Amino acid sequence: MSRAASSPSGIQAVGAIPFGSHFCQFYRTKQDLIDTLVPYFEAGLRNNEMCMWVTSHPLEAEEATALLREAMPDFEEFAARGQIEIWNHHDWYLRNGEQRSAEVLQGWIDREKRALDRGFSGFRLTGNTFWLERSGWHEFVEYESMVNEAFRRFRIIALCSYSLDHCCAEDVLDVCRNHQFALARRQGDWELIESSPLKMAKEELKKLNDELERRV
């Protein structure tokens, strides 16, 4: 049976999104995270995707779980069948007390395989980078570059959250360079930030997904 090449993002400004997408969100407040991530995961769960939310301050795992439970009266049914995992960042990014980029990337890819083996349509994830120290920034930028290249080959949708209060102008450029597009608030509304090369990359990604769908 063929699988759809795209999925509803749950975020109005984004709309349907191809599998293989790796995009970022710049936020200022906890409410910014709630407004995007709760509908993002509800859409993924209802689209039969396996989901993983890696949390950090200001929105930790316990509160994230409570928010999904409040938004989705049937949330426990998804949780009971193991369709969603909600982790604190130190248990995922900093296992053994240090950041291991290749290990983290392989962990995402392994979960995508597990999702497909279990009959899910894909794997949806998010990670909040609030925990990231300045000393680890350059290593994390390299990790994001690896992720951006790798994820396009898998049925993965990934949203990375960056606090604008922790980013300088150079950081914002680093982040945008390693994501297919960015989501940010402008005058209260969420908007997409795309350059021409990124638009071309998305079009190429859609073509690749369409070709894969035809082959199945």
Regions picked out by a protein language model, each given a short descriptive name:
Residues 1-203:
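Non-catalytic regulatory/interaction regions at protein termini and inter-domain linkers
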Residues 196-216:
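Amphipathic alpha-helical coiled-coil "transmission" helices that mediate dimerization
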